[in-house]
Amino acid sequence: MYLQTLHLRNFRNYQHQHVDFSAQKTILIGNNAQGKSNLLEAVELLASLKTHRTSRDADLVKQGEATARIQAQIQRGYGTVDFDLLLRNQGGRTLKLNGEILRRQLDGLGTLNAVEFSCLDLDLVRGGPDCRRQWIDNLLIQLEPVYARILQEYQQVLKQRNALLRTAKKLHRNQAAIPTDLTQQLTLWDLQLAATGSRVTRRRSRGLLRLMPLAQAWHRDISSQTETLEITYCPNIPWQQDDPHHVQQACLDKIEQRRQAEQHQGSSMVGPHRDEIEFSINGTPARFYGSQGQQRTLVLALKLAELQLIETIIGEPPLLLLDDVLAELDPSRQNQLLDTIQTRFQTLITTTHLNSFGADWLKHSQILTVNQGTLQPYARPLSETYGP
């Protein structure tokens, strides 16, 4: 898997920019707020059709423009793919693969696989449960693009069910009886929540089971065999057997237990939208007691495990996007990460300086300067020599 070219038009602070990626490793160097992260965000959009920085396409369109466009040529094991994504300021997208408009944009998922690692990923450990749910969901979409539809179906069911529960809450507040038709509607949506929720929770469990031994091995290596990582999936629906009927029944049983509380609160209190994932180091919860260094080691191990798992399942190494992350790692962890990458993964790295990179890395990298949304080849000082 190789991103050969990228063309941006009116995307963020880029007006018109074309990039030919001429090396396995590309370093984007520049001061803050020049557009380094914006370029990585464009690649993230190609991989996941969303960005961790905003949920509004209007934020992605250059100020004063009506549309933005991202075009890319991607080399896969099965051939070359032309990817064309048009974003509109007023909403609505058009996605083309090899010139053909996709009726369902989710069909574009899986064309490009990428793992992003930024300073914001420390929230994986110290942030709330929603950060960890979003993390595992994003990984599962990379591994199995159909999971995006499964997740979308669940969220639609959740939205409809919550609307009914809000109606029930108003009736409770007014001390009015809940009409039979509302009770019947809720029963139907209970069944839908159990059916769609079981698909989400079972896939999350299986994904974490596959990821955990890889993350544990990386964590032991990075910590010089001094620490043991444990990842525990804590589903909101307690289930013991990986069987759809068993999980659905477990969900319905818990809904029945929490029915009065849900109607009083006006929202769904049962389902995978309330799942938690816990990380512990040597038996101690990393979220509350892990040092900053331990938390960074944990996230680094998770990212390396993601790369390994995606490569194993997809059969091709994904892209790696490193957004100003080297500054967050000490020299030992920097070396661990850079040594692992080498030429195995196509890598795009943003940085404000080149001090973290060895001579061999710089010699075999494409280095681009980013300045106010414009890319230029890095002008190496005459004193810089990276060998013959």
From Swiss-Prot:
Gene3D superfamilies: P-loop containing nucleotide triphosphate hydrolases (3.40.50.300), RecF/RecN/SMC, N-terminal domain (1.20.1050.90). It is found in: Cytoplasm. ATP binds at G30, N31, N32, A33, Q34, G35, K36, S37. Keywords: ATP-binding, Cytoplasm, DNA damage, DNA repair, DNA replication, DNA-binding, Nucleotide-binding, SOS response. One of its GO terms (molecular function) is single-stranded DNA binding. GO terms for cellular component: cytoplasm. InterPro entries: DNA-binding_RecF, DNA-binding_RecF_CS, P-loop_NTPase, RecF/RecN/SMC_N, RecF_2. Its main location: cytoplasm. The keyword DNA damage applies. GO terms for biological process: DNA replication; DNA synthesis involved in DNA repair; double-strand break repair; SOS response. The RecF protein is involved in DNA metabolism; it is required for DNA replication and normal SOS inducibility. RecF binds preferentially to single-stranded, linear DNA. It also seems to bind ATP. This is DNA replication and repair protein RecF.
